């Protein structure tokens, strides 16, 4: 195992919050493999780059010699995690959960080492609780404590219903940590309440409390909201290489650095050198290409990454797209015809519709087929004719 100082530095890279750091240091000094847990409810079958921020950290713990468990919340998925929701989340059927879980396992092994990953389902112990066990578990917390959760607080203040079973969710997730005697649990910053519940339940059941390590939420292609399928601002890890390349190249130059910190495996010193190069005048597009190729090679292959870059060059560089062009921000749902007019590429929407019909309007080098088409969140190069360009961000 790596030295404690070196291991701690790697573990803390990109971490939003570590509760508490001194307890993690103490656990590392014990010189034994720590029990590391990451839980996920298989509510959707596709994993995107936002999910990989935490999986990358889990992979690091594997490389450092610790015991990693990917916990599939098949039981809790049937309850429905209320985190971040202003309405009750509909529970999934057992069939949906198991089908999604199989897809999850296939995808996470693109990141985690299968030989070093233990897969568990929390139904193993939660199904055994029974009515008496559920009542005993519920007795560990009060309604007042549950209403400290931001989402519950807002719903209660707004007169929105909160189902009793939703109060159980943090307790059930916390009980996972008791059942597994977890040393460290990973999660996103939106899971803080649930993660701390695990610490509380472990303390009350005579266990050493787990360390909570929270990773930031990856901002999506729009540069504003967290990456999610529902927001349409995501990059799926199973997407075609050319699709991934184009999406990564569409992010803003500022957002690129966040992606480097959270998604790249390059040394921090190298990333800092990239920043210095850009400040010295290097085109940030060249740095973004390196990021795109690194990510594509990870989930596909280096050959696929090279091919995706070449396709991108063929589509865009040969069209002689200028580096400098007007930039605009527009709301999602705006049709192409309106975007072309409001960005000054066409004098009117009628002209914009005519340009589309004539095949003279392009988005990211592709001819627009429908003037009513509204692009999803992201940053795109719009072109009319050979010389009119605008970089438009859809939010």
Curated annotation (Swiss-Prot):
Keywords: Aminoacyl-tRNA synthetase, ATP-binding, Cytoplasm, Ligase, Nucleotide-binding, Protein biosynthesis, RNA-binding
Binding residues annotated for ATP, in chain numbering: 229
S4 RNA-binding domain segment(s): 334-394
E.C. no: 6.1.1.1
Disulfide bonds: none
Any Pfam family the entry gives: tRNA-synt_1b
Enzyme class: ligase
GO MF: ATP binding; RNA binding; tyrosine-tRNA ligase activity
Main location: cytoplasm
Residue span of motif 'KMSKS' region: 226-230
Stored InterPro entries: aa-tRNA-synth_I_CS, aa-tRNA-synth_Ic, Rossmann-like_a/b/a_fold, S4_RNA-bd_sf, Tyr-tRNA-ligase, Tyr-tRNA-ligase_bac-type, Tyr-tRNA-ligase_bac_2
Swiss-Prot/TrEMBL GO biological process terms: tyrosyl-tRNA aminoacylation
Compartments in which it is found: Cytoplasm
Coiled-coil intervals, chain numbering: none
Catalytic activity: tRNA(Tyr) + L-tyrosine + ATP = L-tyrosyl-tRNA(Tyr) + AMP + diphosphate + H(+)
Positions occupied by motif 'HIGH' region: 42-51
Keyword Ligase part of the UniProt annotation: yes
GO cellular component, one term: cytosol
Similarity comment: family membership: Belongs to the class-I aminoacyl-tRNA synthetase family. TyrS type 2 subfamily.
Assembly and binders: Homodimer.
Function: Catalyzes the attachment of tyrosine to tRNA(Tyr) in a two-step reaction: tyrosine is first activated by ATP to form Tyr-AMP and then transferred to the acceptor end of tRNA(Tyr).
Name of the protein this chain belongs to: Tyrosine--tRNA ligase 2
Organism of provenance: Vibrio parahaemolyticus serotype O3:K6 (strain RIMD 2210633)
């Amino acid at each position: 195992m790596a030295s404690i100082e070196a291991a701690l530095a790697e573990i803390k890279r990109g971490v939003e919050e570590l509760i508490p750091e001194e307890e993690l240091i103490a656990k590392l000094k014990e010189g034994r493999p720590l029990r590391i847990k990451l839980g996920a409810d298989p509510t959707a079958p596709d994993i995107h780059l936002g999910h990989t921020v935490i999986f990358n950290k889990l992979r690091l713990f594997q490389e450092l010699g610790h015991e990693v468990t990917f916990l599939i919340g098949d039981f809790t998925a049937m309850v429905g995690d209320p985190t971040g929701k202003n309405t009750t989340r509909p529970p999934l059927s057992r069939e949906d959960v198991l089908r999604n879980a199989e897809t999850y396992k296939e995808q996470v092994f693109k990141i985690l080492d299968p030989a070093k990953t233990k897969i568990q389902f929390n139904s193993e112990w939660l199904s055994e609780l029974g009515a008496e066990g559920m009542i005993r578990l519920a007795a560990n917390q009060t309604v007042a404590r549950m209403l400290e959760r931001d989402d519950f607080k807002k719903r209660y203040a707004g007169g929105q219903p909160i189902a009793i079973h939703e109060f159980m969710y943090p307790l059930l997730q916390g009980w996972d940590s008791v059942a597994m005697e977890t040393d460290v649990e990973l999660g996103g910053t939106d899971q803080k309440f649930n993660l701390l519940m695990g610490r509380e339940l472990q303390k009350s059941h005579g266990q050493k409390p787990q360390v909570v390590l929270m990773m930031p939420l990856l901002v999506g292609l729009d540069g504003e909201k967290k990456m999610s399928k529902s927001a349409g601002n995501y990059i799926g890890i199973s997407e075609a290489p050319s699709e991934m390349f184009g999406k990564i190249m569409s992010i803003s130059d500022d957002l690129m650095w966040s992606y480097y910190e959270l998604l790249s495996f390059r040394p921090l010193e190298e990333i800092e050198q990239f920043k210095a190069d850009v400040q010295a005048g290097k085109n940030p597009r060249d740095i973004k290409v390196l990021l795109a190729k690194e990510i594509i090679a990870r989930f596909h292959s280096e050959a696929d990454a090279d091919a995706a870059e070449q396709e991108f060059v063929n589509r865009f560089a040969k069209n002689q797209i200028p580096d400098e062009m007007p930039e605009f921000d527009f709301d999602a749902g705006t049709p192409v015809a309106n975007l072309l007019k409001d960005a000054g590429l066409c004098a009117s929407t009628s002209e914009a519709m005519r340009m589309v019909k004539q095949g003279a309007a392009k988005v990211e080098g592709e001819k627009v087929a429908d003037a009513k088409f509204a692009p999803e969140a992201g940053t795109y190069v719009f072109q009319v004719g050979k010389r009119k360009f605008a970089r438009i961000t859809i939010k």
